[in-house]
Amino acid sequence: MRRRTFLGMSSGLGIVATGLTTTPALAGGRRPDLTVAVDGGGDHTGIQAAIDAAPAGATEPFVIGVRPGTYLGQVVVPATKPFLELRGLGRRPDDVVIADDRANGTLKPDGTPWGTSGSASVTVSGADFRAVNLTFANLFDEAAHPEITNRQAVAVLTRADRLVFDRVRFLANQDTLYVNSSAAGVVARVHLRDCYVEGDVDFIFGRATAVFDRCRIHSLNRGSTPNGYVTAPSTDITNPYGLLFQRSRFTSDAPAGTVLLGRPWHPGNDPNAIGQTIVRESWIGAHIPDAAWSDFGAWPWEDARFFEYRNAGPGAIVSANRPQLTAEQAGEYTAAAFLRGSDDWTPERC
């Protein structure tokens, strides 16, 4: 898709999903410490410049307010800068767009490819990061680059712990949202509430512990069968908590029965990556078939930790192909349990 079409089509979908048409960005928040404005009316004109100007080693939030506009270029939040907040100052999440357009196979100046992680429009390595009321996008145009076969194009890559995304849109095609950690066996928690995530192949993936609460998960129609896979978790075997979707909506423009809920990703054929995806108390559209889970190469989905609980909608089918949590298990696999950790983190109170 062309960039303008991509953003225009997606913006309406995200707003309908979250109902965020009239929520002022400043309500209930502290005043920004720095302001970014593409027209030069703020402290900086670019997102990265503002992040570079933020203090290192902070112990309380440092707020960067972003005025409406489209901000192009890769953004990196380094591990040395915890407690950063990017806050969109528009009335809707699509008023502020932070985007880049490279893919896995896009070549660097030295002739080597960027790779999947290197393709990310935004990389978050700083703990206690927060993003509010804005859009992250990877605008890589697959149709315009048939010469590139490795088309993974990440909008956001997370590697840190205790991250919050509130009323945020994530837009791309393959590999939109990469929720990861700094290393295998290291737990990194992410809380996403009232968000919108759009893509086609494995577009929510990684080994982080991530809770999606009241989110809309939208699968694009890429004109194939299967049309894609929503999740590709690579949860470490030592981590009891992977990807949790609760009170969310799974939607698509794709034909009925052509999108899978997920498949187990084993990076580098790691046998200890026993992915977990749980979908509970959510609405699932007809694009999800009876056999909702898929093998990933030689790795069978039955060996992963895939479960559902009390879902509704035409795609919420209870069968032998759709493992369900028991009531007792459902009491254990809650958002609070996923996010609590050893430090009793409660982001819903933030």
PLM ranges: what are they?
Residues 5-25:
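N-terminal export signals
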Residues 30-350:
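Sequence-level preference for short, compositionally simple segments enriched
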